[in-house]
């Protein structure tokens, strides 16, 4: 699709087609990322100021520390968070792969075995919280 955008810019024509192509690309990327988060949404909200559900609101989670916000974290998770104060992509990969391996007794039951799917979720979480 990138070649089409460059072609339109160089030829200075078809700007309507260029804008339509960019709009479709943006919408499909957002829809794809939303789909990656769909399983997470049953237990987590991801809006700025959103309410906690079974799990905490994940807005801006990749830019904040672990065990932060107004969610009531378990003692085990809070102790683990002291040793792991920030969510890094690597830590989030491990968490999504098997949270119970990292924190025994955590409420989170979700496990994503596929690395590519975990990366999609992490990309989405990273995007959700970036100031525009």
For each of these PLM feature ranges, what is it?
Residues 23, 62-66, 97, 126:
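A generic structural signal for secondary-structure junctions
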Residues 1-14:
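Short, Lys/Arg-enriched N-terminal segments with co-localized hydrophobic residues
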Residues 86-132:
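C-terminal capping alpha-helices of c-type cytochrome domains
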Residues 48-86:
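Gly/Gly-Pro-rich "capping" loops immediately C-terminal to redox-active cysteine motifs
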Residues 31-53, 58:
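Sequence/structural segment immediately N-terminal to covalent heme-attachment motifs in c-type
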Residues 18-27:
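Sec-dependent N-terminal signal peptides
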Residues 22, 47, 81, 110:
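Generic anion/oxyanion-binding catalytic loop in active/binding sites
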């Amino acid at each position: 699709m990138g070649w089409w955008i460059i072609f339109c810019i160089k030829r200075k024509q078809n700007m309507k087609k260029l804008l339509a192509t960019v709009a479709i690309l943006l919408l499909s990327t957002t829809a794809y990322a939303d789909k990656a988060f769909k399983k997470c949404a049953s237990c987590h909200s991801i809006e700025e100021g959103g309410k906690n559900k079974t799990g905490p609101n994940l807005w801006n989670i990749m830019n904040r520390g672990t065990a932060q916000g107004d969610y009531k974290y378990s003692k085990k998770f809070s102790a683990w968070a002291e040793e792991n104060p920030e969510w890094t992509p690597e830590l989030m990969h491990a968490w999504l792969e098997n949270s119970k391996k990292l924190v025994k007794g955590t409420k989170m039951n979700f496990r994503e075995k596929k690395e590519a799917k975990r990366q999609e979720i992490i990309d989405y979480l990273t995007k959700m919280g970036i100031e525009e």
